[in-house]
Amino acid sequence: MFDFDDSRLEDPAVLADASPLLRNLASSGARVRREAATAEAPLTALTDVDRPRAVIAYGPEARLLRAVLEPVCPVPFVAWPALGLPGWVGPLDVVLVIGRRGPESLAVAHEAVRRGARLIAVCPPDSQLALQAASRSTTLLPVGTGDPLAAAVVALVALNQLGLGPSTSPDAIAAAIDGL
């Protein structure tokens, strides 16, 4: 078990250390705000979407989203851990891919588009995922900071827009992170 030494908070030498971990934590709230602002315009495209039969989330934050949404989501929500998609996924479903790179995310997005599912891709706009997943049933939510928590917040806002999740305020989440 790690014991935290409170005296480190009063040691000027320790406080002067510009540790990348502390700097990263200190800017987390700003990254959430930035990603939410960047994705604001594409999120409006999600207001005219019918309620899906199910939501399948793929990516490193899929289990976090499932933990938040499972108690309140009115449709089945699956955090899919495997390559590919379940055999039943089709045009009545939403596939949410949160990814920066990698052949796994590309394969899942390609399969979702091929099957006619509504695809929501949370990724950098110039990524392979964004380029290869483009279709009329794809909504690209651009993220650029590489922060998985910020990407998860954008995904939560998108699912709220679809009426599948709780009201999500990126500013309130960012303020809570800033308070850490």
Residue ranges and their predicted role:
Residues P12-N24, A30, R34-A45, G144-T145, ...:
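Active-site phosphate/pyrophosphate-binding segments
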Residues D48-G179:
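Glycine-rich phosphate-binding loops that contact phosphosugars or nucleotide phosphates
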Residues M1-R23, R33, R118, A130-G146, ...:
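Extreme N-terminal leader/targeting regions
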Residues D3-D5, A26-A30, A67-E70:
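N-terminal start-of-chain detector that recognizes signal peptides
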Residues E10-P12, R34-A36, Y58, P74-F77:
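A short linear-motif detector with a strong N-terminal bias
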